[in-house]
Amino acid sequence: MEEFGISPGQLVAVFWDKSSPEEALKKLVARLQELTGSEGQVFMENVTQLLQSSHKESSFDVILSGVVPGSTSLHSAEVLAEMARILRPGGCLFLKEPVETAEVNNDKMKTASKLCSALTLSGLVEIKELQREALSPEEVQSVQEHLGYHSDSLRSVRVTGKKPNFEVGSSSQLKLPNKKSSSVKPVVDPAAAKLWTLSANDMEDDSVDLIDSDELLDPEDLKRPDPASLKAPSCGEGKKRKACKNCTCGLAEELEREQSKAQSSQPKSACGNCYLGDAFRCANCPYLGMPAFKPGEQVLLSNSNLQDA
C-alpha cells in the first residue's frame, strides 16, 4: 500500500469489475480505510457504471482501478477521461491492466505504450510504468473467461499518472516583465538625415528636375468619353436585345423604359369585361376573337386587331 502514497483524510476511489475476486476486494478496501482514517473516505464502484454515475468534478485525491489482486480490468479512452475529470488537481491515478507484448493487430488489448498514450490523452501527466510481470494462472483464466482473449504474450502492467495542478479550461494571468521606456533618443546619422532633407534652396536649383503632373496627360486623356463607347461589345448583340445580369452600360434601363412605354400605349378596357370572352365584349372591343384571359394578364394586340378596332 505504500506505493499508492495514501495519507489520512484523503478521498480514495476504488474501481473494480466482474473479474475482481470478492475477498481480495474486501481486504483491499479494509486496508485503505485504515490508511485514510476517520476523516477520509473510501468509495467503491463497478468501473462499468462510472460513465453513468455523474460524479462531481475533482472529487477524489487518489483513484485505484484494476489493482485488486487477480483483477484483469480493461480501461477504454472514455473511462480514462472520466477518471481524469473526477480526480482533483495534483491527484494520482493508479491502475493495472493486462497488455500485449507481441506485435499483433487487435482492438481489444493495448500495448504498454498505447496504455501510457491513452493516459496522456486523457489529460494526465508524469505517466510512469511502475511494474510489469507475468500473469498468474488465475489471471490467465480470468482473461480467457471474461475477455475471451487467448495469448501467451500477455503481461500485467501497473502504471500511474498525475493530474496537473489546474483544471482543464482554467485561466491564469501571465506575469510579463515590464518594459521600461528609454528616455534616451536614438542617435541619428547626419549623413543619412541629409539624404532625406530637401531645402528651399535645393528647389530653386537648376540641377533639380521636377515633373509637372499636367504634362503626364495628353489632350486625348482629358476628353470625355462617348457613352456609346462604354458599352460592352457583347451587350445587346443579336436580333433580340438583352441586357447582361449586372448591366452597367445603361441598356437595362433603356429596355425597361421601352417596355413601360409599350405597355402604356396598349389600349385599356373601358367596360372591364374584356377578359371574360367575346360574349361580354363590346362591338368595337379590340379583343374580339381572342380567348378569355385572366384579369391583369398582359395581352399583346397585333396591328390588324388595332386597325379593326
Swiss-Prot record:
Domain notes: The twin Cx2C motifs are involved in the recognition by the mitochondrial CHCHD4/MIA40-GFER/ERV1 disulfide relay system. The formation of 2 disulfide bonds in the Cx2C motifs through dithiol/disulfide exchange reactions effectively traps the protein in the mitochondrial intermembrane space.
Region described as Fe-S binding site A: spans on this chain: 235-249
Assigned GO CC terms: cytoplasm; mitochondrial intermembrane space; nucleolus; nucleoplasm
Motif (Cx2C motif 2): 282-285
Observed effect of gene inactivation: Death in late gestation due to defective definitive hematopoiesis in the fetal liver, possibly due to initiated apoptosis in erythroid cells during terminal maturation.
Subunit organization: Monomer. Interacts with NDOR1. Interacts with CHCHD4.
UniProt name for this protein: Anamorsin
Induction (UniProt): By cytokines such as IL3 and THPO.
Role, per record: Component of the cytosolic iron-sulfur (Fe-S) protein assembly (CIA) machinery required for the maturation of extramitochondrial Fe-S proteins. Part of an electron transfer chain functioning in an early step of cytosolic Fe-S biogenesis, facilitating the de novo assembly of a [4Fe-4S] cluster on the scaffold complex NUBP1-NUBP2. Electrons are transferred to CIAPIN1 from NADPH via the FAD- and FMN-containing protein NDOR1.
Protein family (similarity comment): Belongs to the anamorsin family.
Region (N-terminal SAM-like domain): 6-172
Residues that bind [2Fe-2S] cluster: 235, 244, 247, 249
